[in-house]
Amino acid sequence: MQNSEGGADSPASVALRPAAQPMPASPQRVLVQAAGSTPKGTPMQTLTLPRVQPVPPQVQHVYPAQVQYVEGGDAVYANGAIRAAYAYNPDPQLYAPSSAASYFETPGGTQVTVAASSPPAVPSHGMVGITMDVSGTPIVSGAGAYLIHGGMDGTRHSLAHTARSSPATLEMAIETLQKSEGLAPHKGGLLNSHLQWLLDNYETAEGVSLPRSSLYNHYLRHCQEHKLEPVNAASFGKLIRSVFMGLRTRRLGTRGNSKYHYYGIRLKPDSPLNRLQEDTQYMAMRQQPTHQKPRYRPAQKSDSLGDGSAHSNMHGMPDQAMATQGQHHQQYIDVSHVFPEFPAPDLGSTLLQESVTLHDVKALQLVYRRHCEATLDVVMNLQFQYIEKLWLSFWNCKATSSDSCASLPASDEDPEVTLLPKEKLISLCKCEPILQWMRSCDHILYQTLVETLIPDVLRPVPSSLTQAIRNFAKSLEGWLINAMSGFPQQVIQTKVGVVSAFAQTLRRYTSLNHLAQAARAVLQNTSQINQMLSDLNRVDFANVQEQASWVCQCEESLVQRLEHDFKVTLQQQSSLDQWASWLDNVVTQVLKQHSGSPSFPKAARQFLLKWSFYSSMVIRDLTLRSAASFGSFHLIRLLYDEYMFYLVEHRVAQATGETPIAVMGEFNDLASLSLTLLDKEDIGDGHSSEADVDGRSLGEPLVKRERSDPSHPLQGI
């Protein structure tokens, strides 16, 4: 073997002297090539070494440029990280390695294992390493392998498999890109900076992949931050392949939602880009130009944000990663939803306060419409964090803080965005018709927001978007209460009641969506469906009907038809969309006889109660029989109950001409519940007036009776 020529302290050869005492002759030693991709059956190449004379027992100091065998389990450290001295045992031994680590691949397919040092422990063979100047971390700790020590320069270097191109190859790649893309010669330095960014943030690694669009969007972000002109996606792909040789492309993901991935590359653990990886799913982000304007438009839509510091911070976009992720999520929402017009306030014969004029009412209509449009615009861009600032700026504008707050628009066509002072808003909201008009506008706004964020409750959406919506819903009430501090309690209760119904709707719809995704997997599993059908056929539905008939008083023929249809739909292994269509038909059949009747809302509520009672009886029977598919039935039952609620909610809203938010918000506050509203038809006309009063009193909650009769003493309640 040839030794390296560099290194002043590395001798060109090792002189071996015979020992004083004779020793048996040693046969020739054979080194088997450690690794290679040679097909099975092909004889392995052997390297025959001349016979070695025995050596005296003294230690010979051997420096890099040698071959060493390392047993499995022994640690190996990076080249140059340790200096070692070895003692050689002349006993004839032959080692056959079982595996070897790959350092680089040659065109011929052979693999060479390069290492640098001996382990600190004493291996079982005759090569004993005496460790000195230990530094670094082990690089080989698997099964035994031959390690070729030393290098041309004797310097320390990493043994990691990088597969990076040489500087000459990179220069050729830059020249090729300049010619193919028609780039000016002075942009060679720009490409060099792009290459350096790639080398600083990415590394090759086997068995991992990275979405191609994510890598390109990281690059766009880098160019935007450093005011660089980016190359297009195709040129960027050529640039990557010139840096990381042998990079492969794969299409990964579910059918219909697959993305191209670079296979064999990953972010470095210390790269700042790791902070952008907030989503566990694939973040195939949209490409955007570096000069894109902020999507939030506070000046045009929402009024100024009070002080200039808050305004500038919002334009600074410190959380651009969140904005980029939001752009990816926008494909799951309905950004084309049309915002309905608001009704005009019905003042009737209401007398306005002296400080409020009709001009103030018209100004409120214009300003509140613009405020709601700004809210919709922010939500469409999934910039939920700006909602609190919008509400604060609208409800807490001081008359002396800016000219926009002090002045009012002269006409509806006035393009100037203005805010009403807080004192003026309080005076306007004290007028009951104005407050009810604002409540109706909120119903329209929040229903539009719901249909924008969750256009289809059964459609799969990323879990990160679902969680963002739930966090948004959790914060709404606190944001509004904080923004409206100082307003009359009645105004706050009215506003918070509507926003509470909005938040509850978001929570219900996201939970329904989560159940739908979990149930979709069950409905697509043939073995689970067969087990469910087998367990369902063992249920004694006659006994279920007998127990439930007294409570629900349903027609037996209707119950039997629903049972038969359910089993048939289950046997056909229907998809989730087909089940949704079946549930919709059930609601239509049951509520058809009440269509156009004032009792439609009550009939819809009764149907929900009966459906839930029957399904609970079936689940009870499955539980008592220890059905194997109980878990699947429980999940399906939860989904169908929630979806029935969703369908009935929309049917009632359609029948009453209200929005679903208004329907659910009607009974959100316990004070609005009364026996008179819920069961008017159950109260007979023959009751005396005193009994009628007692019935109303008993039907009303204590809070409402106290509010309706201020003179009523608390002790009497």
From Swiss-Prot:
Keyword Transcription recorded: yes
This protein's UniProt keywords: Cilium biogenesis/degradation, Cytoplasm, Differentiation, DNA-binding, Nucleus, Phosphoprotein, Spermatogenesis, Transcription, Transcription regulation
Disrupted-gene phenotype: Mice are perfectly viable but show complete male sterility. Spermatogenesis proceeds normally through meiosis. However, haploid cells undergo a complete arrest in spermatid development before spermatid elongation. Arrested cells show altered Golgi apparatus organization, leading to a deficit in the generation of a spreading acrosomal cap from proacrosomal vesicles and merge to form giant multinucleated cells released to the epididymis. Spermatids also completely fail to form the flagellar axoneme.
DNA-binding region: 194-269
Pfam families tied to this protein: BCD_RFX (PF25340), RFX1_trans_act (PF04589), RFX_DNA_binding (PF02257)
Localization of this protein: Nucleus; Cytoplasm
Positions of modified residues (Phosphoserine): 26, 411
Gene Ontology CC entries for this record: cytoplasm; nucleus
Molecular function GO terms recorded: DNA-binding transcription activator activity, RNA polymerase II-specific; DNA-binding transcription factor activity; RNA polymerase II cis-regulatory region sequence-specific DNA binding; RNA polymerase II transcription regulatory region sequence-specific DNA binding
Gene3D superfamilies: Winged helix-like DNA-binding domain superfamily/Winged helix DNA-binding domain (1.10.10.10)
Region ranges (Disordered): 1-28, 286-318, 685-717
Any single GO BP term: acrosome assembly
Subunit structure: Homodimer; probably only forms homodimers in testis. Heterodimer; heterodimerizes with RFX1 and RFX3.
Family designation: Belongs to the RFX family.
Function: Transcription factor that acts as a key regulator of spermatogenesis. Acts by regulating expression of genes required for the haploid phase during spermiogenesis, such as genes required for cilium assembly and function. Recognizes and binds the X-box, a regulatory motif with DNA sequence 5'-GTNRCC(0-3N)RGYAAC-3' present on promoters. Probably activates transcription of the testis-specific histone gene H1-6.
Protein's UniProt name: DNA-binding protein RFX2
Organism field: Mus musculus (Mouse)
Taxon lineage: Eukaryota, Metazoa, Chordata, Craniata, Vertebrata
